């Protein structure tokens, strides 16, 4: 036969390698003193570490997302603030433009400030020709000169008259408003006072009616109670008279001895009607008492005899117990002596056996090669 190198089956090789790896893992798990003695679960610890790392990664992602969102919100807020500032600027600019462009037409009206000394500095003052313009060297106008002072004074007077009339009208309207408010307040106060007086009158009338009704009810209740008291007193007097009459004619005060006897039980008496015992009854009771004393005396003597007998019996039992204790002590001492001799013999035999083991059996000491043959496999 020829020696041929046959190709092994890959699945068989994979199975052999898997068994070899499992055996190595099993040996590492069994021969690891830390895992075997302390019981540390490495897989559980690794799982906990991975879980903690995963949780920390999730928290970091949350923090990053929160920071990104916060930055986005800040940017949006800044944009909104900028837009609001621009809107306010445009609004103020439009207001200013409106004032400059549209409110110049009121310079010749009542709203024009006639007391402004610089209001005519920007106008050209023609003297001879209406449309001609002369410079300062022409000496046609001077700084601070008012060529239309009369018209300006008239306009100022009209403005003052208008302002005065307006102030007078406002003051008159304010006085009329105050008068109307005062009149309305007086009317409201008068109505409130009238309403309060009416309510007070109604309350007083209600109180008077309640007092009258309460007084009538109290009178009726008092009359009813007086009638009940008179009837109760009359009934009590009648009951007292009946009780006195019954006591006077009763067997208790008449001392009738027959009333103490019961009809259905002659040997029994009625305690509340009994007047005492007769001489025969007292003699019978004394005789019975004497008999009872004699019986009691005999009973005490018999009890004394029984107690004396019990005392003697207890004494004999105590003596027997002392004898038994003495015998028990002697037996225990003899047992201890026998046990001591037996233990000495047993110690001698054990010492001889140990000497034999040390001198004959345990002479060969194991070497390192002896210990290496153990724990070579996990099976």
Swiss-Prot record:
GO terms for biological process: flagellated sperm motility. Residues 154-252, 283-335 form a coiled coil. GO terms for cellular component: axonemal A tubule inner sheath; sperm flagellum. It comes from the Eukaryota. The keyword Coiled coil applies. InterPro entries: RIB43A. Keywords: Cell projection, Cilium, Coiled coil, Cytoplasm, Cytoskeleton, Flagellum. Pfam families: RIB43A. It is found in: Cytoplasm, Cytoskeleton, Flagellum axoneme. Its main location: cytoplasm. The keyword Coiled coil applies. PANTHER family: RIB43A-LIKE WITH COILED-COILS PROTEIN 1, RIB43A-RELATED. Belongs to the RIB43A family. Microtubule inner protein component of sperm flagellar doublet microtubules. This is RIB43A-like with coiled-coils protein 1. It comes from Mus musculus (Mouse). The gene is Ribc1.
């Amino acid at each position: 036969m020829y020696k041929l190198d046959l190709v092994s089956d890959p699945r068989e090789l994979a199975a052999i390698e898997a068994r070899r790896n499992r055996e190595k893992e099993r040996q590492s798990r069994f021969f690891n003193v830390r895992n075997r003695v302390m019981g540390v679960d490495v897989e559980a610890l690794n799982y906990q570490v991975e879980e903690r790392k995963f949780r920390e990664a999730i928290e970091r992602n949350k923090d990053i997302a929160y920071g990104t969102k916060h930055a986005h919100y800040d940017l949006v807020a800044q944009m909104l603030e900028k837009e609001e500032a621009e809107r306010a600027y445009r609004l103020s600019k439009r207001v200013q433009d409106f004032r400059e462009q549209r409110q110049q037409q009121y310079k010749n009206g009542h709203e024009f400030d006639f007391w402004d000394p610089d209001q005519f500095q920007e106008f050209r003052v023609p003297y001879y020709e209406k449309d001609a313009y002369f410079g300062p060297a022409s000496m046609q106008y001077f700084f601070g000169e008012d060529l239309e002072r009369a018209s300006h004074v008239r306009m100022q007077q009209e403005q003052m008259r208008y302002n005065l009339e307006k102030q007078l009208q406002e003051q008159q309207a304010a006085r009329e408003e105050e008068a109307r408010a005062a009149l309305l307040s007086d009317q409201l106060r008068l109505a409130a006072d009238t309403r309060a007086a009416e309510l007070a009158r109604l309350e007083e009338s209600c109180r008077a009616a309640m007092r009258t009704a309460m007084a009538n009810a109290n009178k009726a209740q008092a009359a009813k109670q007086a009638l009940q008291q008179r009837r109760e007193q009359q009934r009590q007097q009648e009951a007292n008279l009946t009780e006195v009459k019954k006591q006077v004619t009763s067997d208790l005060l008449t001392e009738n001895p027959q009333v103490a006897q019961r009809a259905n039980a002659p040997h029994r008496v009625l305690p509340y009607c009994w007047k005492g015992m007769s001489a025969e009854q007292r003699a019978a009771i004394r005789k019975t008492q004497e008999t009872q004393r004699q019986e009691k005396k005999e009973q005490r003597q018999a009890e004394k005899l029984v107690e004396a007998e019990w005392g003697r019996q207890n004494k004999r039992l105590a003596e027997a117990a002392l004898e038994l204790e003495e015998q028990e002590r002697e037996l225990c001492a003899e047992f201890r002596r026998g046990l001591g001799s037996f233990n000495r013999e047993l110690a001698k035999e054990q010492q001889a056996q140990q000497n034999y083991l040390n001198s004959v059996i345990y002479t060969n000491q194991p070497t390192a090669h002896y210990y290496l043959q153990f724990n070579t496999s996990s099976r």
